[in-house]
Amino acid sequence: MSQRKRYSLNVVTSPSIPSPTPSAPIRTNESNWEAASPASAASSFLPNVHHGGTVLNPGLGIMRSPSLNKSGAFGRSGSSGSSTVIEPSNIKLLLIGDANVGKTAMILSYCRELLTRAEMSRSVRLRHQQQQQHKDLGLKKTVVNHRLSMKEKRKRYSSNDFEKEFKDINHFADETSDFGNPNIGDDNNHEMADPNEIVIETRSTIGIDIKTNLVNIDNRFFNVILWDTAGQERYQNAIIPSLYKKTNAVILTYDITNAKSFQSCMERWIVQALENFSSQDLLKARFFLVGNKIDLYKERQVTHYDVVQMVQEMQLKHGIKISGNFEVSCKWVNVVERTMNMIILDLVENGCFENNDPCVSITISDDVQGHEQEFHDTVEEPFNFTRQRQHQLEKNNTVDITKPNDDIANNQSICCV
C-alpha cells in the first residue's frame, strides 16, 4: 500500500480591524446635497414617490434656518444605532384657505407626488397600451366567437358576403385603435413644451385629505401629519369642531393673483381658527402665512407691503403673532419642500409638537418660568440687550504676600508669618 501524503489547508487570515469612523462632522449645507453618497448615514429629503406610505432614500440633511442656534441633520428618515424602538413625535400641520389657492398641490409637492410633463406622458402612453391590449383581446374574442357561430349555422356564403364582413371588422378595429390615442392632435401642442415642467392637475378637496411623512431631525424622528382642508364652506360644517384639535401649525394659504383669497385669511380663516381652538391647544400652535403661485408674478395682486400690513393687523386685532410668511410655487422644484422644512424646524425649536418620547420632556419648570418672567419685567430693552450678573466683592481673610496690604494705608503694623 503506497503511502500518501496528507495535506492540510491552512488559510492565513488577517486580524479583524474595526472600520474607521469618520472624525470630521457632516456638513449640512447646500453644496454637498448632490455630492452625498447614497450610503451616507444621515437622512435625505429626497424620497421616492410613495403610494400609501413613505419610501425614503438615505443622504445628507439640509442647513438650518439662520434663526436657529444649533446645527444638525434634517432628513425624512434615518437609522439610529440604538435597538430600542421609540415612537416618533407627531407634528400636525393644518392648511386652510379659500378654494383653488393650491393647498392640495402644496402637499403633493412636499410629498414628491407631482409629475413632470415627460413622466405624465409616459404614464398616459403606458395606460393607453394597457387599454389597447384589452381592446385587442376583446376584438380577437369577438372574431373567434363570430367564426364559431358561422360554423354552427352551416350556411354557405358567397365571396361578396365574406368581403363585406371583413370590411366591417377592419372598420371596427380602426375605430377602437384611434379612440383615446394620446398622440392624436396633441403633437403640435406639446412640441415646444418643457419635458421637465411640473404638471399640476388636482381636484377640489371634499372634506379633508391627510398625508404623513416621517422626518429625522438630529437623530430624532417626527411624524409630520399634513391636513388638507376643503375651501368650500359646504364641505366644512361637519368637521370644523375636530379640525383644530392638537394642531401645531396653522398655515394660512392664499393666491398672490387673487386679492380676495388674501383678505379671506384675515376676515374668515383666522377668526374660524380662534373660535375652534381650545385654550390648551392654542398655547402650542403657531401661525404661518404662505402665498402660492409665485410663478405668476406678472399677475400679482398681493404685494409685500400688503402682507406686512396684514401681519401687523392680525397682531393688533386678534393678538396673533405670525411666526413667518413665505411665497412659494408648486411648479418650482424644492421650493415648497424647503418652506415646509423651515416651518417644521421652527415648531421643533419652540416645542410645538406632541411628545411621544417618555425620556424627553418639554415641560418648563416653575423656576424657569419665574426667572423668565422676572427677566422680562426688569428688562425693557430689545433682545440684543445683554444682561450681566454682578457679584459683590468680599474681602479675603488670607494675606497675599505679593501685593501690599490694605492696612499699610492705616499705619498699622504688619506681620507676615
Swiss-Prot record:
Domain of life: Eukaryota
Cell location: Endoplasmic reticulum membrane; Bud tip; Bud neck
Lipid-attached positions, S-geranylgeranyl cysteine: C415, C416
CC terms in the record's Gene Ontology section: cellular bud neck; cellular bud tip; endoplasmic reticulum membrane
Binding site for GTP: 97-104, 228-232, 292-295
Subunit structure: Interacts with MYO2 (via C-terminal tail domain). Interacts with YIF1, YIP3, YIP4 and YIP5.
Task of the protein: Involved in the positive control of both endoplasmic reticulum (ER) and mitochondrion inheritance during cell divison. Required for the MYO2-dependent retention of newly inherited mitochondria at the bud tip in developing daughter cells.
PANTHER family: RAS-RELATED PROTEIN RAB (PTHR47977)
Protein name: GTP-binding protein YPT11
